[in-house]
A protein has these predicted regions:
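Glycine/threonine-rich beta-strand-loop-alpha-helix active-site module
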Residues: 135-157
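A generic local secondary-structure boundary/capping motif
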Residues: 68-69, 148, 156-159, 200-201
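Contiguous, glycine/small-aliphatic-enriched amphipathic segments in soluble metabolic enzymes
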Residues: 1-143, 186-210, 214-270, 274-300, ...
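Short, flexible loop segments at boundaries between secondary-structure elements
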Residues: 150-165, 302-317
């Protein structure tokens, strides 16, 4: 059944064609309920998606488009903005290749341009492979950096969302040594503000922001490092002067337990793994038979952009690409969160 044009048009970039991106796109849009809440269009390659449909055994047809507004937006049919940019012989399944990296970058570029021009309401990105992107000549540390560069923003941050936990990172794809150097008052203050605004957009009117320390025990009064005293505490004080309920610095080994206990609505982490490790520890689902991690549910949101962008919180998983085993839960959650954020923007709220 076709859905009305008042539903948000959501672009879903296919990700690296050699990874699990095509499969999780197909599995997500095989769910008829998606068409009750949005008008989804995949930005990708029709030939790759046909291969994914055959792999999953889904009873779906493809509708290649040259204009996203021409989609039928009907359950059972996948509308795809077909860039036709993949040679299946060059971009093999489960392998790093410059050809696949180039294609993945082009999906993101097209999706950003369309969303910026208001041809779409939001962009949801499938997983890319950083090595493949760089081999193709696009020298970025990750998806977030690509988006920031294409859009031309300098102040942005990554937020992960999963099962009531929300974490915003002071830095992401840099070495740990450099991440320590990026713990500066102005940057931490900016990230606290982005976290505050994001929480409000998620429906939390007066969010409590738990700000993690950088060092063990949040520095223990300067015994284990002075970044808390010199940079983080002044940033928290400045945020509080703006009316933001920022608390900290909280020892990094307890801040997430406190957030799970509802003491904080959002955590500001000082670097990539400080935020990612706890989120992925609770975010992975375990196989009931083997006890091994099999799927992750979390969603990545980019803050500081003029458009809504969400993403899966996992990689290309080359080791299972082409097997039909990929779990699409993170992609499904990313689409639903994008729909929610678009709805709030339409209601007059500022989306970050």
């Amino acid at each position: 059944m076709a859905r009305g044009s008042n539903l948000p048009l959501i672009l879903i970039t296919m990700g690296d064609p050699s990874g699990i991106g095509p499969e999780i796109c197909v599995k997500t849009l095989a769910d008829e309920d998606m068409y009750q809440v949005c008008r989804p269009v995949i930005v990708g390659d029709a030939a790759v998606l046909r291969r994914a449909i055959e792999l999953t055994g889904a009873h779906l047809t493809l509708n290649p488009l040259s204009n996203v507004s021409d989609g039928v937006f009907t359950a059972g049919t996948i509308d795809v903005l077909d860039l036709a940019n993949v040679d299946l012989a060059l971009a093999g399944v489960g392998k790093v290749s410059p050809a696949a990296g180039k294609a993945a970058y082009e999906y993101v570029h097209a999706g950003v341009e369309l969303t910026l021009s208001n041809a779409a309401d939001a962009i949801v990105t499938g997983p890319i492979n950083k090595e493949a992107i760089n081999l193709a000549g696009y020298h970025y540390a990750g998806h977030t950096e690509i988006l920031a560069d294409l859009i031309g923003v300098r102040q942005y941050a990554m937020m992960l969302v999963d099962r009531g936990l929300r974490v915003v990172h002071n830095s992401t794809h840099v070495s740990l040594r450099k991440a320590c150097d990026l713990v500066k008052q102005d940057r931490v203050m900016t990230v606290i503000k982005l976290a505050h605004e994001a929480a409000r957009d998620l429906g939390i009117p007066e969010p409590r922001i738990g700000v993690a320390g950088l060092n063990p025990h949040a520095g223990e009064g300067g015994l284990f490092g002075t970044e808390e005293i010199e940079e983080i505490i002044p940033a928290i004080s400045a945020a509080r002067d703006f009316g933001i309920d920022a608390i900290g610095p909280v020892p990094p080994d307890s801040v997430f337990a406190k957030a799970r206990g509802a003491q904080y609505d959002v955590v500001v982490a000082m670097y990539h793994d400080q935020g990612h490790i706890p989120l992925k520890t609770v975010g992975f689902e375990l196989d009931g038979t083997t006890g091994r991690a099999k799927a992750v549910r979390g969603v990545n949101v980019t803050l500081g952009l003029p458009i809504v962008r969400t993403s899966v919180d996992h990689g290309t998983a080359f080791e299972i690409a082409g097997t039909g085993k990929a779990n699409h839960e993170s992609m499904r959650e990313a689409v639903l969160l994008a729909v929610r954020l678009v709805g709030q923007r339409r209601n007059g709220k500022v989306i970050v």
